[in-house]
């Protein structure tokens, strides 16, 4: 049994819709609060200086690069210019845009909360009831509130 094929236009429209949903999720995660952490985390999802090949911009650059290589098979006088333009576009996506996001993240970093356990300033540090005392004394209601990143919160809970 053959399933109906989508036209190229339908296939690309579906792909664009999926990308739009993903970008909407990134934007919503950042903007649901005034806290700096979610904003920085969303920017890192777009471009993470520690992992420049893993963010959204890297994926966009990769698609442009693959299309650039593929289009070289087209026999036309202007293909060399097309590939030059696409190479420039790829560079702008990851280098120029990524560099600006990297600078923005560097400016936001001092505003991030510092984890009380590991001392690092990370976007995912959250102020919470101490997992150690909460696990040992669940009946208590007045646990100390401390800023912890998820790995340190888990570690404190496991130590209880």
Predicted stretch roles:
Residues 148-151, 158:
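Cys/His-enriched low-complexity segments
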